[in-house]
């Protein structure tokens, strides 16, 4: 009798273990399914529903607030060549501001009190954000080692995965098109590239690469709260490039192209050339 009782208890214990295992398996399945759901939701959250090349920005009412960021200046002269980069960017920014000031559709803004003052990129981005910008253009010049024949225009929009990437990419297309119409040769894929920093190493990536990466790009593009593009208007180390886009007349020519690109972005009619 005692033996039979022990066997019954063992049988019950065995049935209890099987039921518990089933519960654990069901809970595991639910947990894995829910985890996959969360992963898919996280992956798709914030992803663009329109392809970059088909994107068009939503335009509000003018006047539009345009931040013009003249690269370098003050204690940072930038690249040196046929011209000094900071002098070229200041001249271009000044000419672009003049066009925007005459056009009632725009309010030109800056990231520094003067072109001769020194400000870090993060400080310039903060100054831009404080002015509630609709668009930012950071003006720079390119350079190459002595003996290089490198020339041409290229620009860098905010990279894929960032909040303002598509608006930045659209603006970059307008800039590249306007510069090409002005006679510039376009570098890379249509004059548009991405930049990533891996520590102190800068990696250039063609705009055909759409993957989202964790590395940061240019600080001013990462930190500003609006579509933004950094433009390299010409190589300061190229006589031909500077004559066309970096000399006194060249800076004015570039500024006009930038102005027309801004007008194309906001779908306004440019003022006639003088």
Residue map of PLM features:
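Glycine- and acidic-residue-enriched helix-capping/strand-helix junction motifs
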Residues: 78-91
């Amino acid at each position: 009798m005692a033996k039979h009782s022990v066997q019954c208890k063992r049988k019950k214990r065995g049935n209890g273990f099987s039921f518990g295992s089933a519960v654990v398996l069901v809970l595991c399945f639910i947990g894995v399914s829910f985890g996959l759901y969360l992963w898919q939701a996280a992956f798709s959250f914030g992803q663009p529903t329109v392809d970059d090349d088909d994107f068009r920005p939503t335009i509000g009412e003018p006047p539009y607030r345009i931040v013009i960021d003249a690269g370098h200046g003050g204690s940072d002269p930038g690249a040196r060549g046929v011209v000094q980069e900071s002098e070229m960017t200041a001249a271009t920014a000044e000419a672009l501001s003049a066009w925007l000031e005459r056009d009632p559709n725009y309010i030109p803004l800056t990231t520094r009190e003067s072109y001769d003052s020194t400000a870090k990129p993060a400080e310039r981005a903060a100054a831009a954000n404080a002015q509630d910008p609709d668009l930012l253009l950071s003006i720079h010049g390119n350079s190459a080692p002595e003996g290089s024949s490198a020339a041409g225009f290229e620009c860098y929009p905010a990279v894929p995965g960032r909040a303002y990437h598509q608006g930045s990419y659209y603006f970059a297309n307008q800039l590249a098109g306007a510069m090409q119409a002005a006679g510039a040769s376009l570098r890379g894929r249509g004059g548009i590239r991405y930049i990533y920093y891996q520590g102190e190493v800068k990696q250039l990536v063609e705009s055909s690469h759409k993957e989202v990466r964790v590395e940061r790009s240019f600080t001013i593009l990462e930190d500003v709260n609006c579509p933004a593009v950094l433009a390299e208007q010409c190589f300061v180390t190229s006589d031909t490039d500077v004559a066309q886009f970096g000399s006194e007349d060249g800076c004015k020519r570039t500024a006009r192209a930038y102005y027309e690109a801004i007008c194309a972005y906001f779908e306004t009619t440019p003022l006639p050339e003088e």
